[in-house]
Amino acid sequence: MKKDIHPDYRPVVFMDTTTGYQFLSGSTKHSNETVEFEGETYPLIRVEISSDSHPFYTGRQKFTQADGRVDRFNKKYGLK
């Protein structure tokens, strides 16, 4: 492998701006902000949505079902 061509992989704290939830993960993304997390100082990356606020993970997801042509026909003529 060539030296000095790979990005620096390091631990960073991701913060969900919607809920304030923070978690530690590895990343190559750089940030000028830092935060104290579990007694250590890490770079801070702000994200708009995470598993703490995404409807799929929180159980607040709504499923919509598009009616097909047959369903629309049956509704139109009062069948079924």
Swiss-Prot record:
Keywords: Ribonucleoprotein, Ribosomal protein
GO molecular function annotations of the record: structural constituent of ribosome
InterPro entries reported in the protein's UniProt record: Ribosomal_bL28/bL31-like_sf (IPR034704), Ribosomal_bL31 (IPR002150), Ribosomal_bL31_B (IPR027493), Ribosomal_bL31_sf (IPR042105)
Gene Ontology process terms (BP): translation
Species for this entry: Streptococcus thermophilus (strain ATCC BAA-250 / LMG 18311)
Cystine bridges: none
Cross-referenced PANTHER family: 50S RIBOSOMAL PROTEIN L31, CHLOROPLASTIC, LARGE RIBOSOMAL SUBUNIT PROTEIN BL31C
Pfam families: Ribosomal_L31
NCBIfam families given in the database record: L31, PRK01678.1
Source taxonomy: Bacteria, Bacillati, Bacillota, Bacilli, Lactobacillales
Name of the protein: Large ribosomal subunit protein bL31B
Cellular component, GO annotation: ribonucleoprotein complex; ribosome
Top-level taxon in the UniProt lineage: Bacteria
